[in-house]
Amino acid sequence: MSDDSKPLFSRPVLAAVMLFCTLAIWLLNLTAPSSKLPTPQIEKWTTTSGIPVVWLKQAEWQDSNKLELRFSFRSVTTNITLIQTTLAMLMSDSLPLSTASINQRLAPLAASADSYYDHENQTIGLTLSNEPKYLTPTLSLATNWLRQPDFKPRTFDAWQTQHQANPPVQHELENVLFFDKTNDQNNTTTTVSLKQVSDYYQSLKSSAATIFIVGEMSPETKQTVKNAINAISQDYQLSNASAEAIHYESISSTIQQNEGELWQTRSAIALVPVSSIKEWISLQIWGADLVSTLNQQQHIDFVQLAFTLSPQRPWAWWNIQYANSITETVSQPSYDASRFISAKSLVFVEQVPSVNDKKAFDTLLDNFKQQLEQQTLSPTWWSYIATQVTHEDGALTVEQFAEGYKDAIDSFTIEDYQTALQHLLKPSSYQEIQVYQ
C-alpha cells in the first residue's frame, strides 16, 4: 500500500524542477517570435558625376521582377506652384517628338513613372521590370525623357487653365504655416510661365541628392542600370540647398473662408525633424489615433491625414469633412457634447487618447506592426522610406532605418511614445482654415 503523505518529489528534485521551469520561461521569452520584418541589404556607389547611389535588396525579392528607381532632389523653394507645375509637365507629353504622356509610352514596357514634391524634396520615380526584354528599352526611353524633356506650350496652357484656379489644400496650408503672413492669404495661386518651368527643371539637375534603386538585380541587370543612371545624371550636381530661410508660423491662428455651414476644417502643424526610428513610429501611431478619434465624432464624415517629413521643416496636415448639416447633428438628443473633440485638440500631447490609455496604445501598435509586416515586403514602400522618411544627409538614413527598425518596433513602449510626441509636436505653430459654404 502506498503512503499518500509521502511527497512526489524530494526537495532537491523539486528545486531543480522549479529552476528548470524558470529557465524555460526565460528562454521562451527570449526566443519569442518578434515582428516578422525583413532586413534589407544595402549597397552603395557613386555615379560618374559624383551622385550617391543606394541599392536596397532583400531575399524576399529574389523571384520578383519589380524594380524601383528614384531620383531624389533637394531644391528648397517657397514657390510650391512652380514645383507642382514642372513635375506635372514632366509627367505629361514631355518626351521629345511624342504626343502621348510618359506613362502611355511606358505602359507597353510594363513600366510607369511618378513624382513627389514638397518645399524641400522632389522625387522622380520609375517602376520597371528587371527582365532584359523590358529593362533595356525602358531605360533607353527614360534616358531620352529625363535628359532633355520637351515641355509643350499647348499642354502647359491646358494644364494652367485646369489647375490654376483650384490649388491643392496642401499648398494652401503650406502658405499659412510657412510663408510670409503679411502676403494676401486669399491669393494662393502663383503665376508660372513655361520658361520658368524649363528653367526650374534645369535647376533640379544642380540640386541632386541621391539615386535609389530598390529590388532584385542580377550582375548583368545591375550593370545595365548603372550605365543608364550614369547617362541620365551625367550633368547632375550635388545639392547644397538649405531650408534655413523658411520659418514656420510660431503663433497659432484660425482663418475663416466664406459663410454658412462649416464644411471643412484644414489643419497644419510644424514638427521637429525626425531623428530616430522610434520618433517615426510615434508619428505613425499618433496619426492613426488622430484619424480614428476624429472619425468617431458624430458630426464628422471622414478625416484625411498626411505627413511631410522633410529634413529641416517637416509638418503634418489633416482635412476634416463634416456631415451635411453639422448644426443639426450636434443639436440631436443623441449627440454627446461631453465627448466633442476639436480639430486642434490632438496637437496637445496630454489630450491624445493613446498617450493616456495603455490599451488603446497597444491596439494601435499591434495594428501598426501587422501593417508593417505586409508593407516591408514591397519595394515601393522601401522607396517611400528612402525618399520621404529618411535623408542621406540627415540624422536618420535609410541604412540606419533598415538595420534598426525591427529592434525599434519590438522594443517600442508607451514611454517612448510619450517622450517622442512631447519632442516632435509644435502646438504653438498650429494653423487652421475653416471653410464654410
Identify the function of each model-found stretch.
Residues S2-N29, Q104-N240, D301-Q437:
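Charge-rich, well-structured scaffold segments of protease-associated domains
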Residues S2-R105, S206-H299, E432-Q437:
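His/Glu-rich zincin catalytic helix
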